Amino acid sequence: MHLRHLILILLEILLFDYIVSVLLYLKYFLLLLENLNGEPELAEVHYMPDNLEDTQEYFEQIQSPNLRWSFTINHAHFDPIGIKGFVEGMDMCLCEEVRVADNNGEYEIHMKPGTGNVDFGEMFRLIESSGFKGHYMNGFGSLDDMLEGREYLLERAFEQGIGINS
């Protein structure tokens, strides 16, 4: 194992301990853990958690009503298990918000809905049938882009027979 990998492992342990400390001391605040995106092996930064297993481990190790999940679908979209794998693998009752942006399925990018290849109708069907009770939040472009994207997303939900509170 390279020294760099040992340092990254130690940093992950320290970060995990720090999160536990934050939850102990800030018991009146809500902390959302986002599923991040994987990075190439030689990348300078490796985000945590960047896959389903890491995300599950955080929730198994830190049992607190103050730790909830922020599900970023465009990060999940280019993960090998995809959006469906995350929705089926996580307890969606732990999900406080779904962060929405389109993606090309190849790398980290926050695109306006309809410009990438996320199947938003299927995404809404999966999430709305999973026990999710939180809110959706757009995470792409300008305010005008997000308002326009909101209409596109509502249309995709409606096509699936899903009424989203607007």
Q: What are the residue ranges of the model-derived segments?
A:
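Histidine-acidic metal/acid-base catalytic patches
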Residues: 2-3, 13-17, 49-166
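Basic- and aromatic-lined ligand-binding clefts that recognize polyanionic substrates
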Residues: 28-62
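An active-site-proximal structural segment forming one wall of the substrate-binding cleft
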Residues: 10-27
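Active-site groove signature of glycoside hydrolases
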Residues: 1-8, 29-39, 137
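Short, surface-exposed loop/turn motifs that are enriched in glycine and acidic residues
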Residues: 8, 41-48, 73-76
